[in-house]
Amino acid sequence: MEEMLANGEVDGAVTMHFPFPIGVSTVGRVVTPAKGREMFVANTTGTSSADRIEGMIKNTIYGIIAAKTCGIANPTVGILNVDGARQTEKALKELQENGYDITFAESARADGGCVMRGNDVLQGTPDIMVTDSLTGNIMVKMLSSAATGGSFEATGYGYGPGIGEGYEQLVMIVSRASGAPVIAGAIRYAAQLVRNKVFEVAKAEFAAAKKAGLKKILDARKAAAKPAAAEELSLIHI
């Protein structure tokens, strides 16, 4: 499969497992149960960064790339209420203030805001739900297999393509529990990404994010993370 992708025999592939490098992770696509809305889940497998918050910032860009390539010109972004959500929100809003084109969703809860809760997951409030890959993986499993009581995944498009800066192999991930409808969905998802030139969309999106100061924001995040890591190490007694 890897040889066929490398030499251009195939434009994309659907598989259960793939060793994505650090910095590349997958953007899932589900059908939410309350209103039947499609929602991209950024991200579901792989590791965007060793730092959780940096990873969620990158996941947002990966999700925007997938959504735009699939025809959503101005996708809305929501951040799932998990550890690091507020720091991610702050960084993304700084990116937005610097000129990066990002539209935040409003939670269905009365207090609104772009940090999403459980009801927003079920209703598909944002076009893109940003989270860490472990939580995103669970979300896809639950939403895809809800109708079967968890016995197999019957709806949606699987765990999605691996996306990362400079990465140009279209590999779509499904699981052992993915039923025929999900496999078919993953193939349709891949075809859409190929036809609409996902790698060109990715280049443009990364360029826009860099122009808006993505590197500076990520560097500041790394600097902020160092004291916390040092403090944790100081508590370890050998």
Annotate each PLM feature:
Residues 1-38:
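N-terminal glycine-rich phosphate/adenylate-binding segment common to multiple enzyme folds
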Residues 1-9, 49-52, 110-123, 155-158:
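Glycine-rich oxoanion-binding loops at beta->alpha junctions
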Residues 12-26, 88-89, 137-140, 167-168, ...:
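Short glycine/serine/threonine-rich phosphate/pyrophosphate-binding segments
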Residues 34-42, 123-215:
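Glycine-rich phosphate/nucleotide-binding loop
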Residues 34-48, 73-76:
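Acidic/polar active-site rim loop that often engages polyanionic ligands
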Residues 53-108:
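Glycine-rich phosphate/diphosphate-binding loop of Rossmann-like nucleotide-binding domains
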Residues 88-148:
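Active-site rim loops that border cofactor/substrate pockets in soluble metabolic enzymes
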Residues 236-238:
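Conserved small/polar residues in nucleotide/adenosyl-binding loops
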